[in-house]
């Protein structure tokens, strides 16, 4: 079960604000921007989905769009689009994980790479540490878009090596 159903059906957005045409990770201050009121991965909606999941026998909930960068993530060929660490101002990662745990639900982490593999690998250790800190037990890694660097393919050797790196990194993070 996932919050993303609202997004793919056009009821809500992955992004927090409509005020940006370009995001600069570690420079864009989301606290100074006006929320668009259609961002799906917010505390209120996620808690509602957690309640639904608990009531209907689900054990986990996937939450896409929780982290900064979604305003210009797709088809821009940006190497540095997400940091996999910084939630939007309306997503309290600790509060939501505690709430989910009280209801017997696990939140599933989402790491959309937008095809920027070097960027994901650059942040992987910290991203998995954040997951461990907050009790996440699983992650869905996304690879929407063309793979960066240019010329690489989703199922070429470059990506096979990346997937192997993912396995080793996640296993090592799980041991900590």
Region roles according to the model:
Residues 40-44, 87, 118, 122, ...:
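Soluble non-cytosolic domains of exported or imported proteins
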Residues 46, 93, 124, 163-164:
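Generic non-transmembrane alpha-helix signal with a bias for helix starts/N-cap capping motifs
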Residues 49, 96, 127, 166-169:
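Aromatic/hydrophobic pocket-lining residues that form π-stacking "cages" and hydrophobic walls in ligand
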Residues 79-80, 126-127, 157-158:
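Short, hinge-like loop/turn segments at secondary-structure boundaries
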Residues 149-151, 155:
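Outer-membrane beta-barrel translocator/channel fold
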């Amino acid at each position: 079960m996932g919050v993303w159903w609202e997004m793919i059906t056009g009821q809500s957005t992955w992004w927090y604000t409509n005020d940006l045409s370009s995001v600069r990770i570690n420079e864009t201050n989301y606290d100074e921007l006006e929320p668009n009121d259609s961002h799906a991965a917010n505390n209120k909606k996620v808690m509602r989905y957690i309640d639904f999941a608990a009531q209907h026998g689900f054990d986990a909930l996937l939450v896409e769009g929780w982290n900064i960068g979604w305003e210009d993530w797709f088809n821009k060929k940006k190497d540095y689009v997400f940091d996999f660490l910084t939630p939007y101002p309306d997503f309290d990662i600790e509060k939501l994980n505690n709430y989910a745990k009280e209801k017997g639900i696990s939140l599933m982490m989402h790491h959309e790479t937008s095809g920027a593999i070097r960027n994901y690998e650059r942040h992987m250790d910290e991203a998995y540490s954040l997951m461990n800190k907050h009790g996440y037990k699983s992650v869905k890694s996304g690879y929407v878009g063309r793979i960066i660097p240019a010329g690489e393919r989703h199922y070429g050797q470059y990506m096979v090596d990346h997937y192997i790196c993912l396995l080793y990194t996640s296993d090592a993070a799980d041991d900590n």
